[in-house]
Amino acid sequence: APLQPYTLMADTTARNDAATAAFEPLWLPFDHPLWIVYSSGTTGLPKPIVHGHGGTVIVAMALKTLHNDVGCSYKPNNFGERYHWYSSTGWVMWNAQMSGLLNGTTCCIYDGNPGGSKDKPDWTTLWRFGAELGVTFFGAGAAFFANCLKAGVDLSTMPGLKTVRALGTTGSPLSADAQNWGTSEFEKLGVHDIWWCNISGGTDFAGAFIGGNRELPLVPGEMQCRLLGCAVEAWNEQGEPVINE
């Protein structure tokens, strides 16, 4: 069944030439506060964290453009890639999704429960949304993909998902079984080179330190590389790095 009507941001923010020419941006310092995000509360009460304009833009451009491989478009004469990463407004992934606008990506935002209702669970809801809008990058928490596997979701019934070329996960470890399920489902749709961008990051800097790289091979249930500018190491019990082990 069709989902609720959606609104394109281009329709709500359209300006005529005169209004656009008259707009004057307000120039601010590099570290001027942009937004406040809150920690999860796992280790106590949620803590407010203020992020500045400059640092947020630098981190977001490196993550979205280089490691998530999203941008204006791979095809001429269209409105750019369609980027969706399901998130509530209370999770930093909402802010991360919005930063896709920095490099010309069209953000597709879903308002609702990705698993249907409590009385009528439906783990195809978000997939149908992606199929309707022709999403090219589809991201969600790793738990979402695990629930789809558990529910036996069949993506072959949604041919509109053929536009998807990348899947993103974060929030918790993605199991190899869940990743293999997703890869197999997209192969049924004729998408034989689906790329998984599994990332790990933090609210404290509104970014990721481990993520994806289109030039590296995929290992189900694993992340591909440390991100640019991030000093990331895995240590043994003696506090020694275990490079290449």
Ranges and model annotations:
Residues 33, 39-42, 64, 83, ...:
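Conserved S/T- and glycine-rich ATP-binding loop of Class I adenylate-forming
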Residues 1-30, 151-152, 194, 207:
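ANL superfamily adenylate-forming
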Residues 1-3, 12, 47-50, 106-118, ...:
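Short beta-strand->loop structural element characteristic of the AMP-binding/adenylate-forming
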Residues 55-82, 89-136, 151-152:
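Conserved AMP-binding/adenylation subdomain of ANL enzymes
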Residues 25-28, 220-226:
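Short Gly/Pro-enriched turn/cap motifs at secondary-structure boundaries
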Residues 25-27, 34-58:
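Conserved AMP-binding A3 loop
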Residues 105, 135-140, 149-220, 231-233, ...:
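Gly/Ser/Thr-rich phosphate-binding loop
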